[in-house]
């Protein structure tokens, strides 16, 4: 296994000499061949060498990365712009740890349009997905996200208005097999489920909707006005009236904008940031036709570099995701960028027209940047307040449990069942005091003794913790990156004792606690009395949040499993209706009640269900029918 390059200067120099003085993308990898960082440069050798000259001057985050680099690879490109575009795609695909400059703050919503589907949907989400692991060649990589937006209330108002003005797909699955639902009858949906509109025609409608979230509402209104005039000339007054209503609704979107510029031809973005001890809050204002049409917000690691470096990285990540028509002619900057020519060339080539980058010094442009900065400072204050509360809770918890360092990873476990039936367990994970949902996990209880009428939370918890730590209990694994500092069990001394019997060999390496309900007592292994603690102190409140989240996650999975069993228990009693056909029925009708309401003809249209089986299903739910 290769050792870090910084510990082998001869090999480091040999690797650096192999890098060309040309534009391209470089990969920094650790000793396990994992990609730590992907970067781009117009001179690969010079850029990569700069990491190893004085690592301490790079900041704590990048210094930690440099001491892990064991291998360097690269791809040469013809131009700097090609390098930036390739870097953006590779970062999406691999998501390297040290490239995650922009933090995933669920506070900010996006609008998603699923262009990967024949009839795309449009909806609001707080989680941005990169399809197929971020592979830009995958179908789901075609989906488009607009945002993240600051004002979620206004965003929901805008989308609600859009859905009233334009007939759009309303449901992820059809409600009926042979007819459209009520949304079609009231003009909210064009009958997507029954193919009453072609995919091409429907996409034309959605492309108009996309223009709204691209900040091109004025351009869309002009198009609709021309189409309305043509419809009136063709005596198609119904279409002309519909277009008129759409125009009026779109004009209403911009009526209450508080920011407007005297030049109604202006198309520019303005970006500024505020940097604190841990976070950097970035705001980007989108000005189109002299009006503020969008406020985007980003959160970055304050240790990512200088203010200019953070701004450059945010702009690169943002504009790599947008379409060429969304790039403005001018971008106003709060601070100079370290590589402005790189970004300017990339944006100009992508837009097909010159894009200017300016740090304004006076008059209206400087006032606009000052306003963006004030908004960034307000957002930073919110972030700092939330971060301070979390830090206080971690410090209090470390003191309460006698830990030498602040707990980084806390795992919470809980069991859910009804008298032993459909028994499941959950694991939730908090990283640095915040939920890390990518590490959550469900468990099915495998113990055959746990069944209806015979519940055993002690045995269930012991089983789950044994499965979680099996490799380490058997001495087959080294301490991994996902090793928890604290394991929290929902329960009292009994639940804790059951888990202690399993994890006894590991108790010197981790802290095991249980949190009982009602009095919120905290128990430690081999101690009869609970820890003296105030239920309202910050550390205990953090444990309560972990415990409650584990309970919620387990309960939701239990309800899902129970509902699935109850649905299938009905269908299992119908002769000839196997597992696959049951899945088709439930996918089509979504519930037993809708299956019960369906006619034999509707049932027969389900894939794999012919007229004879449909009649049998119908008779099962309607035994008195002829």
Curated annotation (Swiss-Prot):
Gene: uvrC
Recorded family membership: Belongs to the UvrC family.
Domain UVR: start-end pairs: 218-253
Pfam families in UniProt: GIY-YIG, HHH_2, UVR, UvrC_RNaseH, UvrC_RNaseH_dom
Organism this protein belongs to: Thermosynechococcus vestitus (strain NIES-2133 / IAM M-273 / BP-1)
Taxonomy of the source species: Bacteria, Bacillati, Cyanobacteriota, Cyanophyceae, Acaryochloridales
Coiled coil: none
Highest taxon in the source lineage: Bacteria
Subcellular location: Cytoplasm
Protein name (record): UvrABC system protein C
